[in-house]
Amino acid sequence: MSHLKNILFIIIVSLFFISSCSTVMSTEGWFMPFDNWLYQLQNADPVEISSSGFEIAVIDYSKDGSESGEYSPEEIKIMVDAGVVPVAYVNIGQAEDYRFYWKESWYTNTPEWLGEEDPAWPGNYFVKYWYNEWKEIVFSYLDRVIDQGFKGIYLDRIDSFEYWAQEGVISRRSAARKMINFVLEIAEYVRERKPDMLIIPQNGENILDFDDGQLASTVSGWAVENLFYLKTIPLEENETKSRLEYLIRLNRKGKFILSVDYVDDGSDSFENISRILDYYEKAKRNGCIPYAARSDLELDEMNVIEGIQPPEALKDYESRTYR
């Protein structure tokens, strides 16, 4: 029985590689400077990552999010020396109560710029990101990241502009423009010290409706979650299509697209393997660089899927067009 399962697994993976070949050919012109990427926000081990085969690694600046767990410049250099591009996760739309900047007094004496706790993510609080007090906190965070030797920053909660519009605090256009301006300020700040620093926003790609072209020209790429699947459930085609319109526009301007869907339930079932491969096929067909994360949303491990992720077998194909 186990022999039969192995044979079927090989068939499934082989079919995926065949379809991937045709996918690469059909998506000629996509800007895809990396074959793969890693997204791990807890317990990331620089030594393990350096020999993993992943080309770009989005990790937290700290092993456990705390100040005491900060990676040393020497640890980040291990990845750089191995040819891995280390990118630091930074939440610019919410304050996190386990970070070095958090003050216990804020629980009872809330600053004007600090909003409500996000019910979906306990310990995360919406912030009025256009306030100078918050910007100064973020810039101090970025100083640490730059000093550590990271090669890029991964800016989360771009979509928080929608929250403040829905709360009626400011108009949607104003909220979007303030977030765009903040990202532009961040890019200018970090690139004064490191001109080649990658700037990668995550989600909230519809903010481009309010962009005059500066944001699209400034970012290095864009990252998206849940583009094709919501955990293990496939999304409706029209829902995906509405987001892809923004991403394709960015990609055609020479910006790479990182995609992470939480499709892997951790089992070796054929259903799980087929779902992961389906996600990969859809992502690559639409110009995205995929990462199949565990469906528990924890991002607390390097999710290596034998024969699939990182997709070493796909590295032999050289038919992509780079610009």
Curated annotation (Swiss-Prot):
Protein name according to UniProt: Uncharacterized protein TM_1410
SUPFAM superfamilies from the UniProt entry: (Trans)glycosidases
A family per Pfam: Glyco_hydro_114
Domain of life of the organism encoding this protein: Bacteria
PANTHER family, sorted: PELA (PTHR35882), PTHR35882:SF1
Signal peptide: none
Organism the protein comes from: Thermotoga maritima (strain ATCC 43589 / DSM 3109 / JCM 10099 / NBRC 100826 / MSB8)
